[in-house]
From Swiss-Prot:
Species assigned in the record: Neisseria gonorrhoeae (strain ATCC 700825 / FA 1090)
GO cellular component terms attached to this protein's record: cytosol
Cellular localisation: Cytoplasm
Pfam family, one: DUF150_C
UniProt family annotation: Belongs to the RimP family.
Protein name from the UniProt record: Ribosome maturation factor RimP
Functional summary from the UniProt entry: Required for maturation of 30S ribosomal subunits.
Cytoplasm among keywords: yes
Segments crossing the lipid bilayer: none
PANTHER family the record matches: RIBOSOME MATURATION FACTOR RIMP
UniProt xrefs under Gene3D superfamilies: Ribosome maturation factor RimP, C-terminal domain, RimP-like superfamily, N-terminal
Amino acid sequence: MDIQTILEKTLPGLGYELVDFELAAQGTLRVFIDKEGGITVEDCATVSNHLSRVFMVEDIGYKNLEISSPGLDRPLKKAADFVRFAGQNAKIKTRLPIGGQKNFIGKIEGCENDTVTVSFDGKTVQIELGNIDKARLRPEFKF
């Protein structure tokens, strides 16, 4: 099995959502997890211990395993992410331009039929999930 398949099969059984993962330089495997209510250090330790054993059995090669929350600017990958975070601001980069534009910063209005609706500068744009190259939440800080 590949890393993504292992993570997608293992994490939900432990009560966590796979947000993203990356195999970085020098063999560091970073896994970003989430759950309702947020992630604690204990959650990261639990997942790390469990995945270490699973990866050993599956003979997945890596030097270091890092488990982390996705952070305030978490990536948005699936339709469910855009539904969950409707009403929040995001930065979205598309693969192909829409109206001559590839970068959008605005409020997520929702996601239906694999199409994300974003409002910005008094306009609304619809972006197909397949056209999204990168999307991240853009947290607002109020002082």
